[in-house]
């Protein structure tokens, strides 16, 4: 039995397969999952697990160089955005932050390696992580 790192076998595989510029989406419980994209559904209840909890665990193993957020976060969930940026910088170091309209974010999610659905119930609490390099 694996005893350290990401214990969810599906997420562990997605993270292990991530290369430079590959993308992984971590989304709220209402996000529409595109057909044909690998989905890992972690939701057990509203808010559980939360977005930050999942991001923190992912960043223990995944190097990120850029994140993509919906512009609507600035109006609907600015506190979540600020917490997310603080957590990512703490765990990963500085990253480029790209914001796009939510409609474009949904289109971009059609091309990710996987989507992890959290229990987050805060509007627009979705992020696309873009893989970096460790050298």
From Swiss-Prot:
Domain of life, per lineage: Bacteria
One GO cellular component term: cytoplasm
Gene Ontology process terms (BP): D-ribose catabolic process; fucose metabolic process; fucosylation
Active site: 20 (proton donor)
Residues holding substrate: 28, 102, 124-126
GO molecular function, one term: D-ribose pyranase activity
Pathway assigned to this chain's UniProt record: Carbohydrate metabolism; D-ribose degradation; D-ribose 5-phosphate from beta-D-ribopyranose: step 1/2
SUPFAM superfamilies: RbsD-like
EC number of this enzyme: 5.4.99.62
Annotated compartments: Cytoplasm
Protein's UniProt name: D-ribose pyranase
Annotated keywords: Carbohydrate metabolism, Cytoplasm, Isomerase
Homology family: Belongs to the RbsD / FucU family. RbsD subfamily.
Subunit organization: Homodecamer.
Function: Catalyzes the interconversion of beta-pyran and beta-furan forms of D-ribose.
Catalytic activity: beta-D-ribopyranose = beta-D-ribofuranose
